[in-house]
């Protein structure tokens, strides 16, 4: 069944306003990952370019630390990263700003152990090989789970593999388990069992989330571009939240997500349900961009320091989070309708 797409309506509404943005030409390179989320749909449809009025060079990365490195070098202006690499980068004072929370991770990341590995409970992890991308949200969740279980991380062989490498290592039988996201997660779950996931670890005191960040110099020079990027993202969240029952394996949105990420379309609906995608009101609340996100970054940084992953924790992470662009996006939406 065809229904009007709110994102396409937004693009039409912004068409005239985008002309003024195009007059201020900007080189825009955006780094994305393979996480399953609604923003992949407007990315596939070219709606970000249409709303902004600029060409975007989209670059795919395997992990947050890779995105951080590209942001630091100036190769990217915008990037999608998790809370753990965000905390690591901002603790080192990388000049970036988180302008939208793109996902609150629940079951979308999980620790899966191989069938036949002999792992039936947390105590069985000792001596086993568990893979995860280092300094990622999954790595943070893995360490948080081990802490909760009072398991010594040094007794577990934790290896640094990106999601594609995890899937390959799993097929070869080189690893006993992995804490990771999709599409690797969807693949390894077919011959393994979930020992815990990010939702449960979050309840134990180590929540994880994902954000879109911008280089501060780019955001200061082109705030309207960042705001329009936020607007398209927020509308994709609203579209999914309002019609999630229609996002089935054979639906067009799910097929687009699968094509961009390499995930099996049959896995996508469940993986989408494994995260929360906050809309504007939630973004601006005290729980997220209104203060909670900065506090969560600080908490993550404290944990990373305990694990000797960062040298020091800043006294205040609020300079690295801004609600301004979501507010501007709200004004653009209202003003152009």
Task: Pin down the residues of each PLM region.
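Conserved C-terminal helix/tail region of periplasmic/extracytoplasmic solute-binding proteins
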Residues: 294-337
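Sec/Tat signal peptide C-region and signal peptidase I cleavage site
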Residues: 19-25
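Short, solvent-exposed loop/beta-turn-alpha elements that line the ligand-binding surface or hinge
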Residues: 46-53, 200-204, 280-291
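Extracytoplasmic/secreted envelope proteins and their assembly/folding machinery
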Residues: 45, 68, 72, 83, ...
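Bacterial N-terminal signal peptides that target proteins for export
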Residues: 2-11
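Secondary-structure end/capping motifs
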Residues: 220-309
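Short, glycine-/small- and polar/acidic-enriched structural segments
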Residues: 26-152, 157-160, 176-182, 198
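A bilobed periplasmic-binding-protein/Venus flytrap-type ligand-binding module shared by bacterial periplasmic
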Residues: 44, 109-119, 208-224
């Amino acid at each position: 069944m065809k229904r009007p797409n709110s994102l396409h309506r937004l693009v039409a509404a912004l068409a005239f306003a985008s002309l003024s943005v195009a007059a201020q030409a900007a080189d825009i390179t955006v780094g994305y990952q393979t996480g399953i989320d609604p923003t992949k749909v407007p990315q596939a449809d070219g709606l970000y370019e249409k709303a902004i009025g600029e060409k975007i060079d989209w670059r795919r990365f395997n992990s947050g630390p890779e995105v951080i490195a590209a942001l630091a070098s100036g190769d990217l202006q915008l990037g999608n990263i998790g809370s753990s690499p965000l905390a690591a980068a901002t603790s080192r004072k990388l000049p970036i700003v988180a302008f939208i929370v793109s996902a609150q991770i629940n079951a979308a990341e999980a620790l899966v152990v191989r069938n036949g590995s002999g792992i039936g409970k947390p105590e069985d992890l000792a001596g086993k090989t568990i893979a995860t991308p280092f300094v990622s949200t999954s790595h943070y969740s893995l360490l948080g789970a081990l802490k909760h279980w009072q398991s010594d991380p040094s007794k577990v062989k934790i290896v640094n593999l990106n999601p594609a490498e995890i899937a390959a290592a799993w097929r070869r039988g080189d690893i006993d388990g992995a804490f990771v996201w999709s599409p690797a997660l969807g693949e390894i779950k077919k011959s393994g069992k979930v020992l815990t996931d990010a939702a449960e670890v979050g309840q134990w005191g180590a929540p994880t989330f994902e954000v879109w960040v911008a280089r501060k110099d780019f955001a200061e020079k082109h705030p309207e571009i960042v705001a329009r990027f936020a607007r398209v993202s927020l509308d994709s969240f609203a579209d999914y939240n309002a019609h999630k029952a229609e996002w089935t394996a054979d639906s067009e949105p799910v097929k687009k997500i699968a094509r961009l990420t390499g995930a099996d379309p049959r896995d996508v609906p469940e993986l989408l349900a494994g995260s929360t995608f906050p809309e504007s009101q939630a973004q601006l609340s005290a729980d997220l961009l209104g203060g909670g996100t900065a506090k969560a970054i600080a908490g993550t940084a404290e944990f990373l320091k305990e694990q000797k992953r960062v040298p020091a924790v800043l006294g205040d992470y609020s300079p690295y989070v801004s609600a301004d662009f979501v507010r501007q996006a709200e004004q653009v939406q209202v003003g152009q309708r």
